[in-house]
Amino acid sequence: MSKVIGIDLGTTNSCVAIMDGSQPKVIENSEGARTTPSIVAFTDSERLVGQPAKRQAVTNPSNTVFAVKRLIGRRTTDAEVEKDKKLVPYAIVDGGNGDAWVEVRGDKYSPSQISAFILQKMKETAESYLGEPVTQAVITVPAYFNDAQRQATKDAGKIAGLEVLRIINEPTAAALAYGLDKKDSKTIAVYDLGGGTFDITILEIDDGLFEVKSTNGDTFLGGEDFDMRIVNYLADEFKKEHGVDLTKDKMALQRLKEAAEKAKIELSSSSQTEINQPFISMDKDSGTPLHMVMKLTRAKLESLVGDLIKRTMKPVQDALKDAGMSKGDIDEIVLVGGMTRMPKVVEEVTAFFGKEPHKGVNPDEVVALGAAIQAGVLQGDVKDVVLLDVTPLSLGIETLGGVFTRLIDRNTTIPTKKSQIFSTAEDNQNAVTIRVFQGEREMAADNKLLGQFNLENIPPAPRGMPQIEVTFDIDANGIVSVSAKDKGTGKEQKITIQASGGLSDDEIDRMVKDAEANAEADKQRKELVEAKNQAESLIHTTKKSLEEHGDKVDGSTVEAIELAVGALEEALKSEDAGKIKGGIQNLMDASMKLGEAIYKASQAEAGTGDAEGEAGPRDVDDEIVDADFEDLGEDKRK
């Protein structure tokens, strides 16, 4: 049975882990790094994922997609998407059903599809390490993701060729990794500030039982926002000094973004850093190049992002309130996500809880490790671990007057199922539309519409008489199914919620086929590169051998080798791996006689050497060296 892998699909970076014996282990990617940038780029000839995509972002900003997790499961009309459109250099467009998609080089991609490219890279990383195919995974999502975002993440897994056995909340995964070997009873708060999202989760841990008491957060608050504050500051300062607006230049903006991220990281360990960006623009009058050389202090950074850090504290307070706890009830605070390396974040958390956070986990890797543990639980490799998670937002339906009627309250332990009886609003009403919402507002329209369906052919009856039972069912992934049943006739209508846009099964199948086709194209491209490398190496060594040993074979053999070299050089121009491999084989066959001649010649030389060595016995005296010795005596020896 193949391994189930654990994947932390992050906004900025992603990470993959497996269970290695009784402990989870992070797997390094092909570049030797333990995390992979969640970036996908499209060039004229290929698709790049991870570090190669990040490296070329400055020169190809419009076709380099990053932070796509912020778009997953969202509509183009969402305020967050409108905000994102102004910040990113790539195009965010309507996918045709109101969903936010991205457009690159004239092609549209859903956020699930872009995420699938990243998941494929994670899958390949695991397969390369394990030496066997991987088909199943546990994937993490922010705890505060709604149903549409969870469903879209599951779709991404399917497109990548993975069966997603479980969607697990990131803070819960972190708690699993933190508490795996801990036997004592503790109440912990997981403060997770990542690249694009923020979560706070309160859990009770007791000898293998992990029970989530409450969760809260903000799915549009993270390191990307911190970076943009620095970018805007740098652009404003440059405009004041040179009168040039760098935000209008996509390439300059991408350079600023990279510089901002680097400066932010450096300021976690030093009090000052220099931002040096030569030739970032041109003076519009004189045409002379303009350079950015600027110092940024930690104090200035903290003043730029102070309100963002403060914003995390409201969800923390709400989570404690929902759990029925006070700050003093928390035994340990676990910090997760790269942004928790920032000293000001640690300072704010310490000030709020009145105690130092736990620093024993790697904030970049702990979520993937937890996902691997959950994978181990599902596979039966990890025993005595029970995880009880919660739904982050209330679920309900729209009733008369547009009111949001809750069926399942937020922070209800999942999986769960709940039913309620409703009736018709008018006499002889023969159909009802069930509109399903998720959120905390009192009016349905202010919450997130997850989907809708109709229950039809209700027998004519006075208003209030028919009994319609609406049942909500949330599985362990936090994904919702809703059914409506007319108790009089037994008629039932049921749906698994798909975002009011969402990807249809046909679209997912098309994307799966597209991903498979791309995987085949990638494989062929790799084969071509490897064949070219082998051919060039063989040509070089053959030519060198001919120069040194050509005189050891007859002229016809030399001519055959030179013809084979020429044919292989010609094949190299064709970009056809099959032709190149054929040329390699021909040259190897032609060179065989040369190899035999070289081998025979070296053997003959070795034989001659031995014969010379045995020509006569050496005079023993030849090896003797005369030397004078002085007797030190006892005193001198001391």
Swiss-Prot record:
Acts as a chaperone. Residues 620-638 have a biased composition (Acidic residues). HAMAP family: DnaK. Keywords: ATP-binding, Chaperone, Nucleotide-binding, Phosphoprotein, Stress response. PROSITE patterns: HSP70_1, HSP70_2, HSP70_3. GO terms for molecular function: ATP binding; ATP-dependent protein folding chaperone; unfolded protein binding. Induction: By stress conditions e.g. heat shock. The modification Phosphothreonine is found at residue 197. It comes from the Bacteria. Belongs to the heat shock protein 70 family. InterPro entries: ATPase_NBD, Chaperone_DnaK, Heat_shock_70_CS, HSP70_C_sf, HSP70_peptide-bd_sf, Hsp_70_fam. This is Chaperone protein DnaK. Residues 603-638 are annotated as: Disordered.
